[in-house]
């Protein structure tokens, strides 16, 4: 019996606000335990939540970016559960009236085709704290994360393979990153994924019993966990067993999914309206103000790069995979840089440098202005492409003007025949064997002579001019 896989994803995205959703405590990552807390986060008796308006702004922005309708009458609910990282014994979330609903995004599949994935809802809520279990036998609670604003984005069960789930997450991350509402760094917990998966015989309309997967710490782990789980469920059904509704965790070491607990239903959380927060009315003017702040998204930019700039689809995809890179590219174009030249540098030397130094493009000294200046120096023959690599490293480390660095470091390319001809004659005098080989008919010997010219000028000779002059001088010797 063959089965069809049904997948839906729940993605938690931490919103990049300065303060928390209901308290003035900072919402920054990486501080000492419990440094970013106050009496609201600790749930001291009598304290009340105060809504952070910026969180609603970001919620509206996310909903618009995901083609969602917006609940203009918005309220919060209590989700009741007891756990040490949740001092109130309930989480303030949204249940029946999320800020966004009925949305969709388009994903690109491996064969180049596209598919629309529907999004059921996007709701705002507060994050929980973090428990750490020490080697000393004690458990520790860090409430820095308690109250950090989240938006949970719940897809419909429209994905039919782990590969489609991977493509959905990639597209969703790009869109959220472009809005600027989150840095979507899975390694810091600002983007977390839970996956729901079931299988059913082909032709059956009813969904099978689903399992939820957790501990999916990268998109690749999502893909691998889903692939294992669809295989496990198929083996259970083929052997006559039944799938249980449960929560399982992905084991990165073994590639398997392991039982965590029997899955709770929403009734287990005893949702009811949050009495300490008012109902919020989101006016049309508010929505339109946020809409005006939306950037051009990756799909639009890719189309522009291919259709207007003549770049390949591959180059366009690489340039738009990061908003910072795409913004840098567009700023360089605004400075007058050649699109293909900037694209080549961003995907080549710049990408390699960022990877080696573990930095982002906004953390280094290279700017659209000094990169454009450097490319112009190459285009007008002031420096060679080889020297440009040295100039780039200097700019990345130190910033500043490419033109001033080239001048102060003595890197200006030698293009004057009056300077190059004596050097060529000196190379002839010091390389008699290569010269005689050339005279004897070995034309490849000229390559070593070019190399010697570049060595003698420490790479500053204009390769085209040097080659032309060399050919002319060699022709005189063989006439």
Curated annotation (Swiss-Prot):
Taxonomy, superkingdom: Bacteria
Gene3D superfamilies according to UniProt: 1.10.10.410, GatB domain, N-terminal subdomain
Top-level enzyme category: ligase
Enzyme Commission code: 6.3.5.-
GO terms under biological process: glutaminyl-tRNAGln biosynthesis via transamidation; translation
InterPro entries named among the record's database cross-references: Asn/Gln-tRNA_amidoTrfase_suB/E, Asn/Gln-tRNA_Trfase_suB/E_cat, Asn/Gln_amidotransferase, Asn/Gln_tRNA_amidoTrase-B-like, GatB, GatB_C_1, GatB_Yqey_C_2, Gln-tRNA_amidoTrfase_suB_CS
Any one GO MF annotation of this record: glutaminyl-tRNA synthase (glutamine-hydrolyzing) activity
Catalytic activity entry: L-glutamyl-tRNA(Gln) + L-glutamine + ATP + H2O = L-glutaminyl-tRNA(Gln) + L-glutamate + ADP + phosphate + H(+); L-aspartyl-tRNA(Asn) + L-glutamine + ATP + H2O = L-asparaginyl-tRNA(Asn) + L-glutamate + ADP + phosphate + 2 H(+)
One Pfam family recorded for the sequence: GatB_N
Function: Allows the formation of correctly charged Asn-tRNA(Asn) or Gln-tRNA(Gln) through the transamidation of misacylated Asp-tRNA(Asn) or Glu-tRNA(Gln) in organisms which lack either or both of asparaginyl-tRNA or glutaminyl-tRNA synthetases. The reaction takes place in the presence of glutamine and ATP through an activated phospho-Asp-tRNA(Asn) or phospho-Glu-tRNA(Gln).
Quaternary structure and partners: Heterotrimer of A, B and C subunits.
HAMAP family in the cross-refs: GatB
Name of the molecule in the record: Aspartyl/glutamyl-tRNA(Asn/Gln) amidotransferase subunit B
